[in-house]
Amino acid sequence: MYADVSDNARIWHNAHVSGHARISGKALILDNATIKDHATITDNASVANNAIVCGQALVKNKAMVLHYSVIGDDATILNDSVITSMAEIVGDAVIAKNTDYEVFKNNWSSGRSFTYTKSNHIWCVGCFYGTGQELIEKAYADSETSGQNYERYVNFVEGK
Protein backbone atom coordinates (compact mmCIF):
# COMPACT_ATOMS: atom_id res chain seq x y z
CA MET A 1 0.00 0.00 0.00
CA TYR A 2 1.46 3.29 -1.08
CA ALA A 3 -0.20 6.66 -1.12
CA ASP A 4 0.49 8.84 -4.16
CA VAL A 5 1.37 12.51 -3.70
CA SER A 6 2.09 14.36 -6.96
CA ASP A 7 1.56 17.42 -9.15
CA ASN A 8 2.59 20.11 -6.64
CA ALA A 9 0.40 18.75 -3.84
CA ARG A 10 1.59 19.63 -0.33
CA ILE A 11 1.38 17.76 2.96
CA TRP A 12 2.15 19.94 6.03
CA HIS A 13 1.80 20.35 9.79
CA ASN A 14 1.37 16.80 11.04
CA ALA A 15 -1.02 15.70 8.28
CA HIS A 16 -1.23 11.97 7.63
CA VAL A 17 -1.69 10.27 4.23
CA SER A 18 -1.90 6.47 4.01
CA GLY A 19 -3.32 3.48 2.17
CA HIS A 20 -3.87 4.05 -1.53
CA ALA A 21 -4.84 7.70 -1.09
CA ARG A 22 -4.07 10.05 -3.99
CA ILE A 23 -3.16 13.69 -3.43
CA SER A 24 -2.53 15.76 -6.58
CA GLY A 25 -3.30 18.91 -8.53
CA LYS A 26 -1.92 21.44 -6.02
CA ALA A 27 -4.03 19.97 -3.21
CA LEU A 28 -3.11 20.97 0.33
CA ILE A 29 -3.32 18.63 3.33
CA LEU A 30 -2.38 20.15 6.70
CA ASP A 31 -3.02 20.64 10.42
CA ASN A 32 -3.54 17.04 11.58
CA ALA A 33 -5.77 16.08 8.65
CA THR A 34 -5.95 12.40 7.72
CA ILE A 35 -6.39 11.07 4.18
CA LYS A 36 -6.58 7.28 3.90
CA ASP A 37 -7.94 4.24 2.09
CA HIS A 38 -8.60 5.09 -1.59
CA ALA A 39 -9.59 8.73 -1.04
CA THR A 40 -8.59 11.32 -3.65
CA ILE A 41 -7.86 15.01 -3.03
CA THR A 42 -7.13 17.05 -6.17
CA ASP A 43 -7.63 20.27 -8.17
CA ASN A 44 -6.60 22.82 -5.51
CA ALA A 45 -8.73 21.21 -2.79
CA SER A 46 -7.71 21.51 0.88
CA VAL A 47 -8.20 19.28 3.91
CA ALA A 48 -7.20 20.66 7.32
CA ASN A 49 -7.94 21.06 11.03
CA ASN A 50 -8.23 17.40 12.05
CA ALA A 51 -10.59 16.51 9.18
CA ILE A 52 -10.66 12.95 7.84
CA VAL A 53 -11.25 11.85 4.25
CA CYS A 54 -11.48 8.08 3.75
CA GLY A 55 -13.05 5.27 1.76
CA GLN A 56 -13.38 6.12 -1.94
CA ALA A 57 -14.26 9.77 -1.20
CA LEU A 58 -13.30 12.50 -3.65
CA VAL A 59 -12.57 16.14 -2.77
CA LYS A 60 -11.79 18.43 -5.73
CA ASN A 61 -12.28 21.78 -7.50
CA LYS A 62 -11.06 24.06 -4.68
CA ALA A 63 -13.34 22.42 -2.10
CA MET A 64 -12.26 22.57 1.54
CA VAL A 65 -12.86 20.05 4.35
CA LEU A 66 -12.18 21.50 7.80
CA HIS A 67 -12.75 21.34 11.57
CA TYR A 68 -13.04 17.65 12.47
CA SER A 69 -15.37 16.89 9.55
CA VAL A 70 -15.43 13.37 8.11
CA ILE A 71 -15.91 12.58 4.42
CA GLY A 72 -16.18 8.88 3.65
CA ASP A 73 -17.51 6.04 1.55
CA ASP A 74 -18.19 7.31 -2.00
CA ALA A 75 -18.99 10.92 -1.08
CA THR A 76 -17.88 13.69 -3.45
CA ILE A 77 -17.12 17.28 -2.41
CA LEU A 78 -16.50 19.83 -5.18
CA ASN A 79 -16.92 23.35 -6.60
CA ASP A 80 -15.52 25.57 -3.83
CA SER A 81 -17.74 23.89 -1.21
CA VAL A 82 -16.58 24.33 2.38
CA ILE A 83 -17.33 21.45 4.75
CA THR A 84 -16.99 22.42 8.39
CA SER A 85 -18.61 22.20 11.85
CA MET A 86 -17.86 18.52 12.42
CA ALA A 87 -19.97 17.46 9.43
CA GLU A 88 -20.08 13.76 8.59
CA ILE A 89 -20.72 13.25 4.88
CA VAL A 90 -20.80 9.62 3.79
CA GLY A 91 -22.50 7.21 1.44
CA ASP A 92 -22.98 8.49 -2.09
CA ALA A 93 -23.58 12.13 -1.08
CA VAL A 94 -22.53 14.85 -3.52
CA ILE A 95 -21.82 18.32 -2.16
CA ALA A 96 -21.48 20.84 -5.00
CA LYS A 97 -22.33 23.96 -2.99
CA ASN A 98 -22.42 24.94 0.68
CA THR A 99 -26.20 24.60 0.88
CA ASP A 100 -26.10 20.90 -0.08
CA TYR A 101 -25.69 19.84 3.55
CA GLU A 102 -26.71 20.94 7.06
CA VAL A 103 -25.06 20.29 10.42
CA PHE A 104 -27.04 20.44 13.65
CA LYS A 105 -26.22 19.81 17.30
CA ASN A 106 -28.07 17.48 19.61
CA ASN A 107 -28.52 19.82 22.58
CA TRP A 108 -30.98 17.60 24.48
CA SER A 109 -28.71 14.66 25.35
CA SER A 110 -25.34 13.78 23.81
CA GLY A 111 -24.26 17.18 22.49
CA ARG A 112 -23.10 15.43 19.33
CA SER A 113 -23.36 16.97 15.86
CA PHE A 114 -25.50 15.37 13.16
CA THR A 115 -25.59 15.94 9.42
CA TYR A 116 -28.19 15.93 6.64
CA THR A 117 -27.11 15.65 2.99
CA LYS A 118 -29.58 16.86 0.38
CA SER A 119 -28.29 14.89 -2.63
CA ASN A 120 -29.19 11.52 -1.12
CA HIS A 121 -31.69 12.66 1.58
CA ILE A 122 -29.66 10.94 4.29
CA TRP A 123 -29.11 11.72 7.96
CA CYS A 124 -25.87 10.77 9.71
CA VAL A 125 -26.07 10.70 13.52
CA GLY A 126 -23.20 8.88 15.23
CA CYS A 127 -23.48 5.24 14.10
CA PHE A 128 -26.86 5.87 12.45
CA TYR A 129 -27.07 6.40 8.68
CA GLY A 130 -30.47 6.51 7.01
CA THR A 131 -33.58 8.38 5.95
CA GLY A 132 -35.48 10.89 8.03
CA GLN A 133 -38.25 8.38 8.76
CA GLU A 134 -35.71 5.76 9.85
CA LEU A 135 -34.04 8.34 12.12
CA ILE A 136 -37.35 9.28 13.73
CA GLU A 137 -38.22 5.62 14.37
CA LYS A 138 -34.82 4.88 15.88
CA ALA A 139 -34.89 8.02 18.00
CA TYR A 140 -38.33 7.20 19.46
CA ALA A 141 -37.07 3.70 20.25
CA ASP A 142 -34.27 5.34 22.25
CA SER A 143 -36.45 7.87 24.11
CA GLU A 144 -39.51 10.07 23.72
CA THR A 145 -37.33 13.20 24.02
CA SER A 146 -34.94 12.10 21.28
CA GLY A 147 -37.82 11.06 19.06
CA GLN A 148 -39.58 14.40 19.42
CA ASN A 149 -36.42 16.42 18.82
CA TYR A 150 -35.16 14.47 15.80
CA GLU A 151 -38.68 14.52 14.36
CA ARG A 152 -38.67 18.34 14.59
CA TYR A 153 -35.35 18.55 12.74
CA VAL A 154 -36.43 16.10 10.04
CA ASN A 155 -39.72 17.93 9.50
CA PHE A 156 -37.96 21.30 9.37
CA VAL A 157 -35.26 20.20 6.92
CA GLU A 158 -37.37 17.96 4.71
CA GLY A 159 -40.29 20.41 4.69
CA LYS A 160 -42.92 18.13 6.22
Predicted regions: what is each one?
Residues A45, V65, I77, D100-V103, ...:
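Intrinsic disorder/low-structure terminal segments
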Residues K26, K105-K160:
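Terminal amphipathic alpha-helical/low-complexity segments used for targeting or macromolecular assembly
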Residues Y2-N98:
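A detector of tandem-repeat and repeat-rich interaction/domain scaffolds
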